[in-house]
Amino acid sequence: MPSISVRRLFDDNQYKLQLAWAAGNSGADNRIGVEADKPVLALVGHLNFIHPNQIQVVGLAESEYLNRLESGETGYQFGDLFDISMSLVIVANGLPVSPGLRDYCHKNDIPLLTSKLESPYLMDVLRIYLQRTLAASSVKHGVFLDVFEIGVLITGHSGLGKSELALELISRGHSLIADDAVELFRIGPETLEGRCSPMLRDFLEVRGLGILNIRHIFGETSIRPKKILQLIINLVEADDEYMKQLDRLSIRTETESILNVNVRSVTLPVAVGRNLAVLVEAAVRNYILQLRGKDSTREFLERHQTQLKENEQHNEDRPD
């Protein structure tokens, strides 16, 4: 199961969440990971001794209870209640850290962080962060682009011209997200987010030209850090026989399953004389229309059927 260290969580969110170390530095390598019986959103929560979260957040009410615990009002000791499995404790709302909590975290190698932010906002940000960071992932071969604000993954065998097609689309004002190895993360039940590894970011390999830095050539707007995957365009090599066998009036919706998420897909035959950049743009525009409930093929078939009925009626009404 995917997991991250407390150290990475701190480094990624230190400035955004105003985090600071208070104790337990030796536990910086503690792991925070998805459990089989718990969703990612359940990893973070207010201090809970019955159903402990991996990340325990101390807010106003929890801080007041800990102060009572430390003063002996409750009849319990820290060790009695804190004998639970947890990876990290965060004291929010800019509250002071009680000496008892600091000592317990130090002795048990549990990282203790503080934040000046309110606990509900802190937990919301951490849940979104963990949902993205710990998402199930896969790597697909292809080129991932932002075309008309739609995340489009172009796939196909090597040598079909995916990179050249991507370069043409970028020159027409669209944006590159990832080339060659597209990292896909399931950030929601029906949502895949495509990203590029830091090593390959900004680069596009084109046969004959080598490695191109798209950001330097086309400017900042030619690159996007991530995008929701909505459409897959699969390039296939086609000859005359293949083109003859195509169903030109198909109304079936093709999908491809990635990480148990169905993504709309379109197959584009690659043949001499076909302008693939224009075809990709047309496919994306058609997809946008279908999202709005407009299907050109179905509309044509309905119009054709209406015309046939009108002709049939006209023939019946015509005198012999």
From Swiss-Prot:
One GO BP annotation of this record: regulation of carbohydrate metabolic process
Signal peptide annotation: none
E.C. number: 2.7.11.-, 2.7.4.-
Family annotation (InterPro entries): HPr(Ser)_kin/Pase, Hpr_kin/Pase_C, Hpr_kin/Pase_Hpr_N, P-loop_NTPase, Ser_kin/Pase_Hpr-like_N_sf
Residues reported in the UniProt entry to bind ATP: 156-163
GO MF entries: ATP binding; magnesium ion binding; phosphorelay sensor kinase activity; protein serine/threonine kinase activity; protein serine/threonine/tyrosine kinase activity
Binding site residues for Mg(2+): 163, 205
SUPFAM superfamilies xref list: HprK N-terminal domain-like, PEP carboxykinase-like
Entry's Gene Ontology cellular component terms: cytosol
Residue ranges, annotated region (Important for the catalytic mechanism of dephosphorylation): 269-274
Cofactor: Mg(2+)
Reaction(s) this enzyme catalyzes, per UniProt: [HPr protein]-L-serine + ATP = [HPr protein]-O-phospho-L-serine + ADP + H(+); [HPr protein]-O-phospho-L-serine + phosphate + H(+) = [HPr protein]-L-serine + diphosphate
Keyword annotations from UniProtKB, A to Z: ATP-binding, Kinase, Magnesium, Metal-binding, Multifunctional enzyme, Nucleotide-binding, Serine/threonine-protein kinase, Transferase
Top-level enzyme category: transferase
Span list, region Important for the catalytic mechanism of both phosphorylation and dephosphorylation: 204-213
Active site: 141, 162, 180 (proton acceptor), 248
Family matches, as Gene3D superfamilies: HprK N-terminal domain-like (3.40.1390.20), P-loop containing nucleotide triphosphate hydrolases (3.40.50.300)
Domain comment, as recorded: The Walker A ATP-binding motif also binds Pi and PPi.
Misc. comment: Both phosphorylation and phosphorolysis are carried out by the same active site and suggest a common mechanism for both reactions.
Role according to the record: Catalyzes the ATP- as well as the pyrophosphate-dependent phosphorylation of a specific serine residue in HPr, a phosphocarrier protein of the phosphoenolpyruvate-dependent sugar phosphotransferase system (PTS). HprK/P also catalyzes the pyrophosphate-producing, inorganic phosphate-dependent dephosphorylation (phosphorolysis) of seryl-phosphorylated HPr (P-Ser-HPr).
Record text on subunit structure and interactions: Homohexamer.
Family in the record: Belongs to the HPrK/P family.
UniProt name for this protein: HPr kinase/phosphorylase
Source organism: Neisseria meningitidis serogroup B (strain ATCC BAA-335 / MC58)
Lineage: Bacteria, Pseudomonadati, Pseudomonadota, Betaproteobacteria, Neisseriales
